[in-house]
Amino acid sequence: MSLEPFIDSKPFTFGVELEMQIVNTHDYDLTKAGSDLLRLIKDEKIPGNITPEITESMIELSTGICTTHEQAVADLRKIRDTLVSAADHLNVGLCGGGTHAFQQWSERQIVDTPRFQYLSELYGYLAKQFTVFGQHVHIGCPDPNSALYLLHSMSRFIPHFIALSASSPFVQGVDTGFHSARLNSVFAFPLSGRAPFVLTWDSFEEYFSKMVHTGVVNSMKDFYWDIRPKPGFGTIEVRVMDTPLSVDRAAAIACYIQTLARHLLLDKPISPKEDDYLVYTFNRFEACRFGLAGTCINPQTGERKTISEDILETLDRIAPHAEALGSGNALAEIGAIARSQVNDATWLRGVVEREKSLHEAVRQQCLEWRA
């Protein structure tokens, strides 16, 4: 199977995907209602799409192609309201968060589609453990070589995206000590991590052909990389974020990525090198484990900062691009998160500390999603 052609798209357009938790409303455990929700909303007109995910306790929403922060917020709120109305009709709840706080993975039911059943056979229990919930952001690229440049230069900022979105401190009733425990589940898959270091589309096509020849992959969907090209959309897809607890935060993070992309492609401040990845896994771990207080090492200078400090300095650098895109309000929210060092994981721990109940924490997650 050959790699599909890269469709050139309008630079810096973006789309947002959010994987959502579906919970019951008596003890707020996950429940099997994905197919029922899809049946209920199949005739609704929304500015995007709603699709099944690998288990019946999940659903994915996606916006259309957005150009501004204002549009992304409006699209996400409209889709959210449609889903919440349908969920209320079924007497189930919806919430964000990268993991469910106390669900047992063995109770999950794989959705009955050929691809999901194939993944279940291939990966065994990992498929059910993959009931985790992420935000993906697509960024439009003018050509395939620009997409690969953006992919590798954007990798420098992966710790920012993880720490800002982190919302998965609890797994199976236990505080993991991580801000984003979700990514530990993703990292278990053999084709996860970072993309190979190639900077031309010809080289990427050659790599893809070799992987297909080995029988390891059939399509780009088989790669679970932190950032991957999506040739059929003409985008790169940033995949490291936990699903935030609110659509407004999801939109702000998406626009931070959009603004960074404009800075990287127009200003070309980074010359990507293979050695940039020497600290990649360390920086990624620090963001997952410690959130905004984690350490971030600049791969080119070796300078160490906290992730929150690095975000604030980055916001200063990209301010002209925020003005050009109209994303000032989004980046103001990102700055407030970085200065306070309070992400959704910190908020969730605060709820559990006050209420002494993971069930109550999930109930409040549902309220945050509706707000």
Swiss-Prot record:
EC number(s) reported in the record: 6.3.2.2
MF-aspect GO terms: ATP binding; glutamate-cysteine ligase activity
Transmembrane segments annotated in the record for this chain: none
GO biological process: modified amino acid biosynthetic process
Catalytic activity: L-cysteine + L-glutamate + ATP = gamma-L-glutamyl-L-cysteine + ADP + phosphate + H(+)
Top-level taxon: Bacteria
Signal peptide (from-to): none
Primary role: ATP-dependent carboxylate-amine ligase which exhibits weak glutamate--cysteine ligase activity.
Annotated protein name in UniProt: Putative glutamate--cysteine ligase 2
Keywords linked to the UniProt accession: ATP-binding, Ligase, Nucleotide-binding
InterPro entries referenced in this protein's UniProt entry, alphabetically: GCL_type2/YbdK_subfam, GCS2, Gln_synth/guanido_kin_cat_dom, YbdK
Disulphide bridges: none
Claim: ATP-binding is one of the keywords in the record: yes
Family: Belongs to the glutamate--cysteine ligase type 2 family. YbdK subfamily.
